[in-house]
């Protein structure tokens, strides 16, 4: 199973890339984690946010390989603790499909992304900086993998 993180935004600070890569390189070859960046629309004083969100949504949906399970990360989703994420990962593996996890931009995800989602995951009721979410998701997925494989990374 391949896991694809699709995130709105590019040109992240180096600490984001370094933090994200710390976890990517730990994943086994039979479960690689990849990142697809979607350019964020220009936002300014007179920006048409609905149009920007729609364009980001189109680009996000186009980046999802056909047949992938779609999981959106959003504040209205269900909070998952580590055992729940590990359980979901096992179900995803048994499903036999690859997984695309979607992270929206400053205004969140486009309605078409949310509508296509099979699962909605809330990392926190807090508003988190989008660059930090990439690292948190990568670490959480690695931790869940370690639970499922009895790897010593996770400790109860």
Swiss-Prot record:
Q: Name one GO molecular function term.
A: rRNA (pseudouridine-N3-)-methyltransferase activity
Short name of one Pfam family for this protein?
Answer: SPOUT_MTase
Q: Name one GO cellular component term.
A: cytoplasm
Q: Read off the InterPro entries from this record.
A: Alpha/beta_knot_MTases (IPR029028), RlmH-like (IPR003742), tRNA_m1G_MTases_N (IPR029026)
Binding, S-adenosyl-L-methionine: 73, 104, 123-128
- Write out the entry's keywords from A to Z: Cytoplasm, Methyltransferase, rRNA processing, S-adenosyl-L-methionine, Transferase
Which domain of life does this protein belong to?
Bacteria
Is Lipid metabolism there in the keyword field? no
- Which enzyme class, named as a word? transferase
- What reaction gets catalysed by this protein? pseudouridine(1915) in 23S rRNA + S-adenosyl-L-methionine = N(3)-methylpseudouridine(1915) in 23S rRNA + S-adenosyl-L-homocysteine + H(+)
- Quote the subcellular location field of this record: Cytoplasm
The enzyme's E.C. designation: 2.1.1.177
Identify the main location: cytoplasm
Q: Which family does it belong to?
A: Belongs to the RNA methyltransferase RlmH family.
Subunit-level organization? Homodimer.
PANTHER family, sorted: METHYLTRANSFERASE, RIBOSOMAL RNA LARGE SUBUNIT METHYLTRANSFERASE H
Known role: Specifically methylates the pseudouridine at position 1915 (m3Psi1915) in 23S rRNA.
Q: Which protein, by its recorded name, is this?
A: Ribosomal RNA large subunit methyltransferase H
Organism in which the protein naturally occurs: Pseudoalteromonas atlantica (strain T6c / ATCC BAA-1087)
């Amino acid at each position: 199973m391949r896991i694809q993180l699709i995130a709105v935004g590019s040109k992240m600070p180096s600490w984001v890339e370094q933090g994200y890569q710390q976890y990517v390189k730990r994943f086994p070859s039979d479960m690689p984690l990849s990142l697809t960046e979607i350019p964020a629309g220009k936002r300014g004083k007179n920006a048409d946010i609905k149009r920007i969100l729609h364009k980001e949504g189109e680009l996000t949906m186009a980046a999802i390989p056909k047949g992938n399970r779609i999981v959106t990360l959003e504040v209205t989703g269900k909070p998952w603790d580590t055992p729940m994420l590990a359980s979901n990962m096992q179900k995803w593996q048994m499903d036999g499909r690859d997984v695309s996890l979607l992270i929206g931009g400053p205004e969140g995800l486009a309605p078409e992304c949310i509508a296509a989602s099979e699962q909605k995951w809330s990392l926190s009721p807090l508003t988190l900086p989008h660059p930090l979410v990439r690292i948190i998701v990568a670490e959480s997925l690695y931790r869940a993998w370690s639970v499922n494989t009895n790897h010593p990374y996770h400790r109860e």
